[in-house]
């Protein structure tokens, strides 16, 4: 079976404010780094966006993909079946409010359907080499938005 591991992270300078996302993708001995940013966003949106952009970068389907994220928001949405509940409830949360970041969640649902994707929580800012690298990439996305390249 073809397997890929992905580390992701999002960051925001102010919340809301300029934000960035970063991801590192591993397949065998190949490593690919990607990042980007948005001028007016939130940290949570950037955490989701990092996973979306990483899955878009795969350009494959039917693979086993493990995504490592330090975002409890993203990991719990999948592993605690929040997304399934939101969909069943017409994209409303348990308080009957519209789900925040619905546009990104819908895109992520589509992309996760192309491969066998599982999410695992990693502790942020705890010395995990690849989580730290994703944080650096996300902050680079913010710097480039601010013209600091």
Where are these regions (language model features)?
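Short beta-strand scaffold segments in enzyme catalytic cores
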Residues: 21-25
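Short amphipathic alpha-helical face segments that pack within enzyme cores
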Residues: 45, 49-53
